[in-house]
Amino acid sequence: MSPSTPRRIAMVGATGAVGETLLQILAERDFPVAELVPLASERSAGSTVDFAGRALTVRNLDDFDFEGIDIAFFSAGGAVSREHAPRAAAAGAVVIDNTSEFRYVDDIPLVVSEVNPHAIARHRARGIIANPNCSTMQMLVALAPIHRAAGIERINVATYQSVSGAGRSGLEALGRETAALLNFQDVEPSRFPQRIAFNLIPHIDAFQDNGYTKEEMKMVWETRKILEDDAIQVNPTAVRVPVFYGHAEAVHIETRDKITAAAARTLLQQAPGVVVVDERRDGGYPTPAVHAQGTDPVYVGRIRDDISHPRGLNLWIVADNIRKGAALNAVQIAEILVKSLI
């Protein structure tokens, strides 16, 4: 088939935040769609979603036959992917999975479209391609050009992750708690371990035996797999912040070869998917609300030499976690698939 041949698409989790954004981006980018089948749980079956100005009826995933589907996007949680993604792949669909279920399986590629698109070809082993964690993804879009030029040995990163990373319930919790506090009412935390409104929580996902959280360890495991370099040391701290959309990261790297902040800035200005916002003035840096929300690029600012290490650099990295952190990358993978692989 040619790249312009319309494809049959299944969208698992079509009623969720990532699923809705996937539908929007497929339409925005004129992806060649012959038929789009939105799928969800029995509870959501029968509802409608919008795609390119048309209302599509959501079908029940449990009894859907994937025969004839070319690409199946999965964005409904790990348990759903575990049960249904292999079934879709066995029927001949290429699965692009937005959960963590398959990221650490050796023969399933973990892909950031700007960083390791060559890995997509490895999908033939299992018929599944994994989308990375949103925080890993935006970090590596920015760091990969520097790694190729100077070799990154160590990454220290603190993330500032919006509540949309916890789904609709996270958005609702922040809105509800903020309204309550502004009305001088007491707040009992519901979605997060402590109240999220006007607060910072240094805890995302389950604690591991080594004291790190699973969210933090995802950044370790995924960075090494995507860059195909097990020697890279990654030291993360993941923090939930009272922002609706957009993740930010304070990143410090140590490189094998010396690279100056000026040279790194030039590399990043030429890097696909990156927009440099790095002016030494008030407001001359990217932020989630002003730059990232609702947009596609990974924004990088505060690029500066580390005054404490001869081969160190500091960067500030911001992106929309629902768009580039999940939905956009999945669509970019699909675009590469239809251009050259299926």
Regions found by a protein language model. Name each.
Residues 1-196, 231-233, 266, 284, ...:
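N-terminal Rossmann-like NAD(P) cofactor-binding subdomain of oxidoreductases
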Residues 123-130, 199-210, 315-317:
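Helix-loop-beta segment of a Rossmann-like dinucleotide-binding subdomain
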Residues 165-168, 208-211, 243-246, 261-262:
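Short acidic/glycine-rich loop or secondary-structure boundary segments that cap or lie
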Residues 197-244:
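Oxyanion-binding "anion nests"
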